[in-house]
Amino acid sequence: MLNVNFTNGELLNTQGLVVFIDEQLKLDSNLITLDQQHHGLISKTIADKLQFTGKYGQIKVIPSVIKSGEIKYLIIAGLGTEEKLTEAKVEELGGKILQYATSAKISTISLKIINRISRFTSQTFASLVASGAFLASYRFDKYRTNLKEAEKFAVESIEVFTDNNTEAAKLFEVKKLVAEAVFFTRDISNEPSNIKTPQVYAERIVDILEPLGVDVDIIGEREMKNLGMGALLGVGQGSQNESKLVVMEYKGGSKYPTIALVGKGVIFDTGGISLKPSSNMHLMRYDMGGSAAVVGSMIAVAGQKLPVNIVGVVGLVENMLSGNAQRPGDVVTTMSGQTVEVLNTDAEGRLVLADAVWYAQEKFKPKCLIDVATLTGAITVALGSTYAGCFSNNDELASKLIKAGEEVNEKLWRMPLHDEYDAMIGSDIADMANISNIPRAAGSCIAAHFIKRFIKDGVDWAHLDIAGVANSNKVSSLGPKGAVGYGVRLLEKFIKEYNR
């Protein structure tokens, strides 16, 4: 794991020294002194706009001209224009720096925060850059047995020079804790589905949350049957691995209302008898991304001992083919007593959520409930990989979630709810169907309305459809290909601000 230290003294044992310059390309007195120590290397570089313009995210790695000492490279990072610099952008810049250092095989780097950036205190800026680098250091290569030496290389340590190193270290410790929660979310999402069976996944939740003071209860199929969870059980009945409902409760402040987080945990989704195409079916190991975001959020909240009351409920199932699999046309009775005609077995996530959200409301009486799910391909068609979809029955709740997402660059786009969508899930033989009676119309909105049927009056509810953002087929500033860990930082930020 990347080692991060903060100092206000001399930088020691570093191979790469990083400085930050904006588009004005002006050196303050501190940078002028540093430039002189490096024989004008900084001023010469920024004088040539073909080499460096100060544009945000631009990274220039230059061999050092100093023959003595450890420093082999000078790294100049562009800040862009200061008025456009946000906390999220500073974090992403930290990630870019780490990735450039990794490519250049620089094992130790030092970040020198010596020029004044009026939008941030030096300690805030320092902690944000370090946080971004830490997030970008994540790897999932545990099953690679033939890694080349170049692929094994990783930056070992980052030293951050700032005038208030003690406060910067305190700020970073919180960000590091949240990043480690993101790493759990990425890890469990990236795991192959033959490894993370519902039982194994449930046990990992217990192992990580109980030491943090979270009560965890694993509910098996017999108890779920007694509770009347016909929708969730129907999804998993084709699998030889037993479905689980994992219930997590964190009590941090008795005076605060309970927030419920509910996650879809489809460990692997073949589509069932409504079989998916085989070309990208392997990616369905990520179909439990909503549940992973919920667990990661619980880790982040409990790890900080925040004064809030949070419950997490995740339904862990496999949607598999077998002689016992659910059939199109089956009717299931949900825990709420409402019946559902299953017209498409590949619209299974909403069935899992129907029972999970009802259970959360029945047991914990939350004021606010947020469900998170890789629910529909339609949301990816609508929003791509830039935004997740946000549906809500409460404008204030939606606004708070969207604001939290903007602050950590996990963006949400408000999507519509309308009675006409609700009318499209009618059934001739049950209370509702699990898909629209108008093919290919408003798929993500229909799915949201299905879940809304199971939200009780008076509960502030939001549904986050993260199907387009939960995993990525390209490297980002804050992580490699694969699971993104989307939702953990968003929900942690939202929960911190909810009662303010």
UniProtKB/Swiss-Prot annotation:
Mn(2+) 2 binds at residues 264, 269, 287, 348. GO terms for cellular component: cytoplasm. The lineage of its organism: Bacteria, Pseudomonadati, Pseudomonadota, Alphaproteobacteria, Rickettsiales. Its EC number is 3.4.11.1, 3.4.11.10. The keyword Ion transport does not apply. NCBIfam families: PRK00913.1-2, PRK00913.1-4, PRK00913.2-2, PRK00913.2-4. Keywords: Aminopeptidase, Cytoplasm, Hydrolase, Manganese, Metal-binding, Protease. The keyword Metal-binding applies. It comes from the Bacteria. Its cofactor is Mn(2+). Its main location: cytoplasm. GO terms for biological process: proteolysis. Belongs to the peptidase M17 family. Pfam families: Peptidase_M17, Peptidase_M17_N. The active site is at 276, 350. It comes from Rickettsia canadensis (strain McKiel). It is found in: Cytoplasm. Binds 2 manganese ions per subunit. It is an enzyme of class 3 (hydrolase). This is Probable cytosol aminopeptidase. Presumably involved in the processing and regular turnover of intracellular proteins. Catalyzes the removal of unsubstituted N-terminal amino acids from various peptides. Mn(2+) 1 binds at residues 269, 346, 348. The gene is pepA.
